[in-house]
Amino acid sequence: MSDALVRRLREQIAERDRAILDAVNARLKLVAELKRHKETQGIDFVDTEQEERLLQGLETTNPGPLSREGLRRLWTEILALTKREVND
């Protein structure tokens, strides 16, 4: 692999990494807003049935190459991270 190709691919990966970071931060803001609203309504913040529906929906629309197991592991961690972040 040429140095120019390595550089170009690394730049593209870095762009995707920044996009992922932006998306996670945007998701955290939305979840924090949802949590505040649920608290005012007396609704439990965590909804395990909704989390499972989310995972199933993502599995259905995942074009790959991320495996089903990989998707579940990734989103389980994102959900856990989200709960930790909005509860701090």
Enumerate the language-model features and the residues they cover.
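Domain-level signature for soluble enzymes in the chorismate/prephenate branch of the shikimate pathway
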Residues: 1-88
